[in-house]
Each structure stands twice: as C-alpha cells, then as structure tokens.
Amino acid sequence: MDLELKNRVALVVGGKGYIGTAVADRLRAEGATVVVASRSAGDSPDSVAIDTADQASVDAGIARVLEQHGRIDALVVTAAPSAGTLDPARKSDPDQVLTAIDGKALGFLRVANAVLPAQRAAGFGRVVVVSGQNAYLSGNITASLRNTAVSVIAKNLADEAAGTGVTVNVVNPGTVTDTPSPEVRPGGPGDSSPQQIADLVAFLASPLSVVSGESISIAHRVLGQITI
C-alpha cells in the first residue's frame, strides 16, 4: 500500500534511538525526506540538533528544518529517557516523577508547540508520539505518570487542531524487543519490535490516516484489563 509519503518532509525527534532509527528507516522507505533530530546533530545534512529539555534548542532546531525544507509534514517524537534510567526505589519520589514528566511529556509538548503553527498554516500535518503501556499500569508512579501525561497532552493538542487538517496521536508499545514473543503474561502487555512500531507510526504519519486524538496500543494491550 502506497502511504503517499513520497517527498513529504518528516522530522523524527529521537531518530538515532532504538525505535527512532526504525521509524526513520521506514519513512525513508516510503519516499519521505527524513530529518533526524537528536541532541548532537553530527555532520549529516539530514540531521538537526534538538534537546527537547531546552526550549531555545527546540525553537532553533525547528526553525532550521523549516528554513531548509519549507515545511514539516510529519512530526514523530520518540525521544525520552529510557525506562531503564528510572530508579525503582524512587518510583514515588516527587523529584524523580517531575524529572520524568519533563523529560518525556513536556519534551514532546515543547516540540509539538514549535511545529504545530506551521502545520496549521499549511492546512496539513501529522504528529505522532511514542509513549508506552505503563500508562495503563499501576505500581510505579513515575512510569505511569510520565506516559499518562503524554496521552493527556496529545489529546488536548488533537482537539485544539480539530478541523485544521492536523492530526495528533500516541502509539503505546509494551515490551520492545528485536525478537517479540507471541506470548502475553496476565497483567502485562505484549511484545513488539521497533519495525512493527515503525509500521504503525508510518501509517499515522501519512495522508491516508485521518485518526486523531487516539492513544493506540501496539501488540497486545495489557492482558486482563479493560479501559474505556
């Protein structure tokens, strides 16, 4: 299926990471012009330095992409500190909670706020953020809140953009691994690979998708839990 991404400009924030690399590769395979954003841009002309924790860095990076390419048709945000950086012993520590929310949810908000005005002006845009199924799970306040906050922000942005041609959605993986297992544990989410995540992201980033305001689980959503 042609996703109609040929010659579209896609910015992948966190595009050097585990999931971000797969997303960037998938979008390139569809013919998109992909700009990869990370904290250090390197020498590639298709990369830009953006630190999502620093508003000035975000604004400068987005301005550079718009100057070079004229538009950002699709924004994909995969940048966030790894869950492995969270200290389980501090899962209810307010300082860790705030740091985690800033690193993931507010980092997304900073970038989205910088890109959305140009997308609205163009009458077209796709915003996709990769979060996680910890949003549905209790037991770790830090992990739950930083992912839930992403979904709340994305839904608000989607509603604000309703009717403008711009869509905003969240993709929530469970366990991400190169060798996903078909088995799903009770009380846990299913496995998915970076490439499987990238397939869903590419569709949501394409003109073919009119979905907006959704938080979509990839692989099995937490087994044994009903959320409406």
Task: Give the positions of each predicted feature.
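Rossmann-fold scaffold of SDR-type NAD(P)-dependent oxidoreductases
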Residues: V13, I72-P81, K104, V129, ...
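C-terminal helical subdomain
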Residues: G163-V166, V170, P186-I226
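Rossmann-fold cofactor-recognition segment
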Residues: S44-A56
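Catalytic loop of short-chain dehydrogenase/reductase
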Residues: P81-S82, P94-Q96, A100, A105, ...
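Active-site Tyr-X3-Lys motif and surrounding loop/helix of classical short-chain dehydrogenase/reductase
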Residues: A60-E67, D87-K91, D95-G103
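Conserved glycine-rich cofactor-binding loop
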Residues: K16
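A glycine-rich helix->loop->beta "capping" turn
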Residues: R64-V77, A83-T85, T167, V210
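Active-site loop of short-chain dehydrogenase/reductase
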Residues: R8, G70-A74, Q119-G132, G163-V166, ...
